[in-house]
Amino acid sequence: MAVNVRDYIAENYGLFINGEFVKGSSDETIEVTNPATGETLSHITRAKDKDVDHAVKVAQDAFESWSLTSKSERAQMLRDIGDKLMAQKDKIAMIETLNNGKPIRETTAIDIPFAARHFHYFASVIETEEGTVNDIDKDTMSIVRHEPIGVVGAVVAWNFPMLLAAWKIAPAIAAGNTIVIQPSSSTPLSLLEVAKIFQEVLPKGVVNILTGKGSESGNAIFNHDGVDKLSFTGSTDVGYQVAEAAAKHLVPATLELGGKSANIILDDANLDLAVEGIQLGILFNQGEVCSAGSRLLVHEKIYDQLVPRLQEAFSNIKVGDPQDEATQMGSQTGKDQLDKIQSYIDAAKESDAQILAGGHRLTENGLDKGFFFEPTLIAVPDNHHKLAQEEIFGPVLTVIKVKDDQEAIDIANDSEYGLAGGVFSQNITRALNIAKAVRTGRIWINTYNQVPEGAPFGGYKKSGIGRETYKGALSNYQQVKNIYIDTSNALKGLY
């Protein structure tokens, strides 16, 4: 199914600053393409340092009034944003599919509705937030207030462009902050279209959207003296740079980074549930998910039962046109990512790994214009293998046989990452014991890759700092102020 791109996407986009689309300080633009077809979708402005200065100054000015709005006012505006997102769900979902390559069934069911729900959720969180008063003694009391930090500088990755933006924007503005946010230069279009909703609902300057290269304007955002809080979703390598910028400027940072998560299948697992959960863990969004269950640890008693079922399941996945409602896996987001995946397949072939399913780029039936890859299952001898240690970020699953629960825990923890993981078992006590022992920020039991609001998401170790997607995330964007009152009017004397 082909659509008229201009029904969804403008030919050119400026920078969204102070509630308007404006020209950048440079005439340079970046071409944005559809990874499934190679078609040019739009051209975006390539922001420069001067544009970052402009956006931050606007955000600082807007903060003066926005931070004084009531919680109920902010909550209503967040609800309005969520409502308008849902009213335009089909359009924005199609933009996300065209720009990212993911199936329309996912963008319609997950990306856009969950983004809308985050605005609704944080509207309720801020509306019900309460401070505290503590009577220290009969004459003194301590009041605790939660106040906005100021200007938030955020950059989000290309794998969930709109959803990740909502994870940042909703709590930031709910808390009374303003924000300067930059999407990936390859997948900015959904957020730029949603800027029109911000234009309708929010005061000018509360949300500002820059487009450009992460190494240029993204880096300038994180190193700007006028930015009071950093928030980043992306690779661990870039996360180090953001952490360094935060340390240099002595500002807080929320970092959601890479992962190499273990999905553990115990010998008492419901295999139907496990097969579905394994596919959700590694094939959702073409495997371009930081929390992907990319290491499969299977109990030796069921290994020979489970692997053939997975081989069959992987071979039956429909990979193809992302606009087709029947498509289960679309295109990888770009050539660089496809080449990275292929390099790991090549490494597997040159090692003692065994490719059990997939392992090839798909080029038939018109897929040669895009970056399509087969669901791939690879058996590796142990967890020290390159494919078991490094984040591939694609539909490539390594499978390792384990003899018992403790070995599964040990292997799961033998990683520099600690973002997520899964356990499949009919014995909830057994599953909980493993979940508690695995050092990750999120563990799913008998499911995988469910990402609703109301459940904290974030990682241990090199997977990041901080948690998002739950009410505690509001504190990422707040300062705590204590007001200490003495009502005695009595002289205390020097200590």
Swiss-Prot record:
NAD(+) binds at residues 212-218. Its EC number is 1.2.1.3. It catalyses: an aldehyde + NAD(+) + H2O = a carboxylate + NADH + 2 H(+). PROSITE patterns: ALDEHYDE_DEHYDR_CYS (PS00070), ALDEHYDE_DEHYDR_GLU (PS00687). One of its GO terms (molecular function) is aldehyde dehydrogenase (NAD+) activity. The active site is at 256, 290. It holds the Pfam family Aldedh. Keywords: NAD, Oxidoreductase. Disulfide bonds: none annotated. The keyword Oxidoreductase applies. Belongs to the aldehyde dehydrogenase family. This is Putative aldehyde dehydrogenase AldA. The gene is aldA.
